[in-house]
Amino acid sequence: MERTLFLNGTIAEESWFDDDVTPQLFKEELMVGDGDITVWINSPGGDCVAAAQIYNMLMDYPHNVTVKIDGIAASAASVIAMAGTKVLVSPVSMMMIHNPMTVAMGDTAEMQKAIEMLGSVKDSIINAYEIKTGLSRAKLSHLMDAETWMDANKAVELGFADDVLARAEIPEDMEPPAVSMLYSKAAVVNSLMDKIAASCRTNPKKTEDSKPKGRSVDSLYERLNLLKN
């Protein structure tokens, strides 16, 4: 049975709340089964190295990988999409490619190192685009320099996708995917808030310790009168 994986959210090396797509989480889901897979992508991108790891996993997967873009595959997410045996895009989805970015501090030597590093990262990204599209490296470099946004038809025209998704006929008795991987930041936040709220809802029981301690005012007056007499 073909499996379906959902790659939704920002791509990162690590995740505090499992709300990002990480290579480790993706690998765990990818390796739990066998056979052909469909990967739905809706991601704004993220870490280039993490995306490269996921790309390599899909390229090395021994069965067919159908990538379907149902929202956006931008930046690093577009690199992952290139690993598909077939890439399909929704009529209302978008793809975006651009130059890699980083933050650097230091003197001119450090800045030059950062520039050279970005150049190498760009070359590695172009490798993935070139394999899929067949476009020249110069053309791909120009598209990245311009931060190119592509609708479904443009993505197919340039070779980043193979076809536009058509309306699928889904049988009523169709079973849910054998394995699904959904990273939803909203779901994680809501779950965390529910747990916090539950821990705050306490119903303290009344015990004898909760009763006021000490002597009454009347008893104090009686002792005071005795002292006066």
Report the location of each language-model feature.
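N-terminal organellar transit peptides
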Residues: 1-68, 72-76, 83-96, 101-229
